[in-house]
Amino acid sequence: MFTELRSKLSPPRGRAGAVRAGFGERRDVDATAHFSFCRTLLEHTVSAESIPCHLPRTPGTSLTWHDSRSQRAASSRPIKLLQQPGTDTPQGRLYSDHYGLYHTSPSLGGLTRPVVLWSQQDVCKWLKKHCPHNYLVYVEAFSQHAITGRALLRLNAEKLQRMGLAQEAQRQEVLQQVLRLQVREEGRSLQLLSQASFGKMS
């Protein structure tokens, strides 16, 4: 009796083996499909990472940190100006102001340099412009004594007579033009001093 009941309740061995075999085959199919999916995903990731990516930088775009740092270092070099001890105005600024005054001031005439820096040729040009009547006489005397701009400002009647200008009219003509030149140079010096003092105050 018990043997018949057990045989009825328990499934046949052939059917159970078939069910177990079918379940095992389904697990194998799922594992194979999962492996193929992972492999495809891995190959896609590797192929995407192996593609070289070079973005061209178009003109006008923002620079990178390294580019901006190198340009900032190149453009931020300090420029030092010479400065005399005890003064607040750098020499570079003072000289540039004086240079601009000599060349751009409308009240100083056509001179581009101070008279003390004139050469013998500059003095001869000045004589030709301001003393045209006896120009050849003056040029010969001035050339023999190598009169420069500094010596021109120091001329007087006695020196002109020793230079060979025996006529009083000639000496007076030269001295009159020298006096005008001295007045103009003194005005220029005062203007330079006032400009320098104004620069220190500002």
Swiss-Prot record:
Per the record, the GO terms for biological process are: cell surface receptor protein tyrosine kinase signaling pathway
Task: Using the record's annotation, list all stretches that form the SAM domain.
Answer: 118-184
* SUPFAM superfamilies in the record: SAM/Pointed domain
Q: Which Pfam families match?
A: SAM_2 (PF07647)
InterPro entries in the record: Aveugle-like_SAM_dom, SAM, SAM/pointed_sf, SAM_domain-containing_protein
Q: Name one GO cellular component term.
A: cytoplasmic side of plasma membrane
What is the protein's given name?
Answer: Sterile alpha motif domain-containing protein 10
